[in-house]
Every structure is written in structure tokens, then in C-alpha cells.
């Protein structure tokens, strides 16, 4: 299990998301709508929808907005008929990157993604070129100061796969993707509110970067996340607290 803290990355990511909350909401609504269209509007029977709603609530989306997105997807609204596509590539320094998209026009999306990679010193790869480096898992992250023993007891009893305590005191709870929402709900019921919770692609081996390369990789990821069709971007870059502070 990779033992790299997500805490520094979370703080940096939240600062960026606060500056572009409207676009984040658009992506979250799209995920809820597609999840409801593919698996139905009952979140108890649809793990993907349950996870999407949990993420939306964590980002302070109103329940009314969430409900409208669920109804839109479950009702078969034609505008909800987008397809999911995944692109893989390499960033500066050979950093592995996965880009998950939802689109109604593959040609437009792949063109935008390829252009962004190329202009940022990377290159778009073929299917499977980097995916083997990642494992899909749920990660529930807690800030320094949480009661480690109590959290560990509750998380393990709820079915967590692993719990990592980092040098800065932050804690990551790892789950099977299918158990993610159930474990998150148990933790919340027991009073453990996380700083971040997501089903993500986690790299077993992280790429260590110097400051210059890290800045270029972070810029590429930011540009990819700004594309309208892009839902999520994953990389194996190890953005340490020191690197993030140096980059600013």
C-alpha cells in the first residue's frame, strides 16, 4: 500500500476548487446524472450514485440541486446521454496521467485533451499505456488531530482495507470501491468527518519530482481539469508539502 499523504494535495486542491466552484458543480451534476441514468435513481441500489451524491454534499451542493440531477438522469433525459471515455498519457518527467471524461463528441474531447498534453510538454498515450500503474480504490482522508485509535477501530470494523497514518498526523482510510459509500456513512455516523473522500485511481509507486518538473506537471493537470469534458485527472506524481510550498 502506498504510504503517501494526500493531505498536502487536498489543501492545494481545495484552494483551486474554491476559485472555480461553478465548474466543479457542473462536473458533479454531470456525474450524478450519468450515474442515475446508468444505474437508476435509487442510491441504495446504485453504489456509483451514492458515491456521487456523497461527493456533491461534501462540496456543499444543495439537496434540491442533487435531486434534480437524479431525476434528470433516471428519467432518461436526452441531454444526459453522454458517454464516458478515458485517456492515458505522460506529463513532464514521464509522470503517468489518467484523464476521465464525459462527452457527447469524442472527436472534440480527444482533440482538446491531446492539445493540452502536447502544449504542456507531455504526450497522449494509447489505451492501457499507464492504467496498469494504478489501482482503483476509495480513499477517505482526515486532517491531523483526529483520534487515530478510535478512527482505526471504527474503520476496520466497517470493512476498511487499510489505514495509513502519515508523518504530518493526517490519516488515509483505504476501501474497496464498492464499499466506499457504506464505510464513509459509518464513519460520519460515528462522528468522523473527513476532509476529502473519493473513489480514485491510486498509484502504487509515486514519481518523485524536482520543483521545476512538479510545477510543469501541476500546470498540466490544472489545464486538463479546466476542460469542460474532463471529470477527473489522476497522476502518479508525488506532490509533497515541500514541493507545493515551493510552487506556491
Swiss-Prot record:
It comes from Francisella tularensis subsp. tularensis (strain WY96-3418). The lineage of its organism: Bacteria, Pseudomonadati, Pseudomonadota, Gammaproteobacteria, Thiotrichales. One of its GO terms (molecular function) is DNA binding. InterPro entries: Integrase-like_N (IPR017856), TACO1_YebC-like_2nd/3rd_dom (IPR048300), TACO1_YebC_N (IPR049083), Transcrip_reg_TACO1-like (IPR002876), Transcrip_reg_TACO1-like_dom3 (IPR026564), YebC-like (IPR029072). Its main location: cytoplasm. HAMAP family: Transcrip_reg_TACO1. This is Probable transcriptional regulatory protein FTW_1073. Belongs to the TACO1 family. It is found in: Cytoplasm. GO terms for cellular component: cytosol. Gene3D superfamilies: 1.10.10.200, 3.30.70.980. Pfam families: TACO1_YebC_N, Transcrip_reg.
Amino acid at each position: 500500500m502506498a504510504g503517501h499523504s494526500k493531505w498536502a494535495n487536498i489543501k492545494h486542491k481545495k484552494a483551486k476548487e474554491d476559485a472555480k466552484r461553478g465548474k466543479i458543480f457542473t462536473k458533479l451534476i454531470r456525474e450524478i446524472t450519468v450515474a442515475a441514468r446508468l444505474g437508476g435513481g435509487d442510491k441504495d441500489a446504485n453504489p456509483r450514485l451514492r458515491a456521487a451524491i456523497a461527493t456533491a454534499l461534501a462540496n456543499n451542493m444543495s439537496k434540491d440541486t442533487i435531486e434534480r440531477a437524479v431525476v434528470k438522469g433516471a428519467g432518461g433525459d436526452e441531454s444526459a446521454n453522454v458517454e464516458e471515455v478515458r485517456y492515458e498519457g505522460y506529463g513532464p518527467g514521464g509522470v503517468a496521467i489518467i484523464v476521465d471524461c464525459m462527452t457527447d463528441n469524442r472527436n472534440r474531447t480527444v482533440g482538446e485533451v491531446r492539445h493540452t498534453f502536447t502544449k504542456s510538454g507531455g504526450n497522449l498515450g494509447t489505451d492501457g499505456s499507464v492504467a496498469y500503474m494504478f489501482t482503483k480504490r476509495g480513499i477517505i482522508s482526515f486532517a491531523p488531530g483526529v483520534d487515530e485509535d478510535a478512527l482505526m477501530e471504527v474503520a476496520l470494523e466497517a470493512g476498511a482495507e487499510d489505514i495509513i497514518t502519515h508523518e504530518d498526523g493526517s490519516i488515509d482510510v483505504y476501501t474497496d470501491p464498492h464499499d466506499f459509500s457504506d464505510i464513509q456513512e459509518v464513519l460520519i455516523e460515528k462522528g468522523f468527518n473527513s476532509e476529502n473522500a473519493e473513489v480514485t485511481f491510486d498509484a502504487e509507486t509515486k514519481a518523485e519530482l524536482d520543483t521545476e518538473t512538479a510545477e510543469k506537471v501541476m500546470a498540466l493537470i490544472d489545464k486538463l481539469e479546466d476542460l469542460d469534458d474532463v471529470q477527473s485527472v489522476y497522476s502518479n506524481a508525488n506532490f509533497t508539502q515541500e514541493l507545493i510550498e515551493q510552487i506556491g
